[in-house]
Amino acid sequence: MGVDNLIQVFEDKYYIDLNGGILEAFGNLFSQNVTVLLYPMLKKDKLIDSNNLVVNNKMKNLYKFFKDNKKIIDIKDYNKKLLKIFSWKVLENIKKGKKDWEKDIPKNVSDLIKKKKLFGYS
């Protein structure tokens, strides 16, 4: 999972429909022996990983609990060239009909997206 996605996971607005809120969701997720392997990201040319990412102030202790218990682990062997590519941006470019999205993903994946007209490709 990418850092930007993990930050969103820690936003409690996504869990308002659950009786137990974010605690219920995280209890279900992590009770299944799930470990998040965290892919870093670049933000203003600074590498962000599990050690320096910032979550909502209300979630700091919950995040620290998962980090301290090795439920969130940094991926160390990552491709630096991929750090500036975001899935949401690729999807946005597909939907807008821009051609430059193809350079950001493997050719076999772009071929499949085009063949099956996935993600709004036309």
Walk through the language-model features, giving the residues of each.
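Active-site cores that bind ATP or allylic diphosphates and position pyrophosphate for catalysis
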Residues: 1-122
